[in-house]
Regions:
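N-terminal capping/small domains of soluble enzymes
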Residues: 1-76, 272, 320-333, 337-339
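Active-site-proximal beta-alpha core segment in soluble small-molecule metabolic enzymes
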Residues: 35-201, 215, 223-226
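Short glycine/threonine-rich loop-to-helix capping motif typified by GTGT followed
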Residues: 178-183, 211-220, 247-253, 257, ...
Length: 379
């Protein structure tokens, strides 16, 4: 049990034991299925925890030059890099930090592949393909929506791939099940398997939430084993993000005031949904609050409000078993993925600290933010 008194407030706190539990499961899937599973930095990049990850996995995936550099310098291995578009300015550094580079279009491949050849370090290049199939319901997160900017459809690929394309990358999941992957593979193979003899690797992207309690990992392993049996020469790669740190930590906050308007009580916190939990408003993703239930049934009902000037910076209603008090701790569950990587300093609101609760039961504070962090971003 975390001793919250050892941490500043607000604070993102990851539990090492829960992280290791997820890492063990993911390594078991990879070993049994004969595939490689790598960490996607877009969901989680708390680099001080990378030594723990390196006990279980070898590589990571990047979507930008900064993520690629983080992979090389902090994770300790070159990145599998994909970006919707590379620039002349960034590409030399992308090459320095990457073992694999996936291009989003043939134009980008034709523009930058000569630089890869000239660089001469053996970078493996691929192209992102669009199977035109995804079961992601939230349009904001659907990479295969009509008119998407991501990937090449089968009708636009030449019969013979250009020299230098060694892999396909396909990403069309978001917190998905193995059964969604099964249906995706049917579409992917129907549209693109005729090119499989020409490539060396197939990256199935992220969104495979294999650490969720109801996820059928045995079915996933069987699926991947079957895919490898059908295409034994292909190296299969998965790059989930959330799965690695699913349910591994919290965001702690405190009540700083309680206001009431038209019968609605709002507990104003020292955190912000728009600044520190943006998916709650964008997705929208419904967070869980420790010791509270969603809904307006009960004696002590509160809306939870963020401490910014955005009118919509609130969530709720929540039912508590007692009246909230100023200074009381409010704990948001499962707030390690897609939070720290997406936070901002809107309004100059104090940014939560970043910390870990070690398996030995000790608090390690990785980062505390200050006025200088805010000032340094502004100019």
């Amino acid at each position: 049990m975390i001793d919250f008194n050892q941490f500043p407030s607000p604070c993102y706190i990851m539990e090492e034991e829960l992280l290791r539990k997820n890492l063990c499961l993911i390594k078991n899937v990879a070993d049994r299925a004969g595939v490689e599973i790598i960490l996607a930095f877009k969901s989680f990049a708390m680099w001080r925890s990378f030594p723990i990850f390196r006990e279980y996995i070898d590589h990571s995936t990047a979507s930008s030059v900064y993520e690629a550099r983080l992979a090389l310098e902090e994770f300790g291995s070159k990145a599998h890099t994909y970006s919707p578009a590379y620039t002349e300015q960034d590409f030399p550094e992308i090459m320095r930090c990457s073992s694999h580079i996936t291009f989003n279009s043939m134009q980008q491949f034709e523009r930058f592949y000569p630089m890869v050849v000239a660089e001469g370090s053996g970078i493996s290049c691929g192209i992102r393909v669009n199977p035109e199939y995804s079961e992601v319901e939230t349009e904001l997160y659907n990479p295969c929506a009509p008119g998407t900017r991501f990937g090449i459809t089968a009708d636009l690929l030449p019969d013979v791939l250009p020299q230098g394309i060694e892999g396909f990358h396909c990403h069309c999941h978001c917190e998905s099940s193995s059964y969604e992957l099964e249906r995706t593979l049917e579409h992917l193979e129907a549209k693109f398997s005729r090119w499989f003899p020409q490539i060396k690797w197939l990256n199935l992207g992220g969104g495979h939430l294999m650490t969720r309690k109801d996820y059928d990992t045995e079915h996933l392993i069987t699926l991947l084993q079957g895919l490898k049996a059908r295409h034994p020469h292909l190296r299969i790669i998965l790059e989930p993000g959330s799965a690695f740190i699913w349910q591994t930590g919290v965001l702690t906050s405190e009540v700083v005031d309680i206001v009431e308007s038209r019968g609605i009580k709002t507990a104003i916190l020292n955190v912000s949904f728009t600044c520190h939990m943006p998916d709650c408003l964008e997705m929208p993703y419904q967070p869980a609050v420790r010791g509270a239930e969603m809904g307006n049934e009960g004696k002590y009902i509160y809306r939870l409000g963020g401490n910014s000037c955005l009118s919509g910076d609130y969530m709720g209603l929540w039912s508590f078993d007692h009246p909230l008090q100023i200074g009381e701790r409010i704990v948001f569950e499962d707030m390690i993925h897609y939070t720290m990587v997406k936070t901002n300093m809107f309004n100059g609101i104090h940014h939560p600290a970043i910390a870990i609760w070690t398996k030995e039961g000790k608090a390690e504070i990785y980062k505390q933010f200050s006025y200088e962090d805010y000032r340094g971003r502004m100019s």
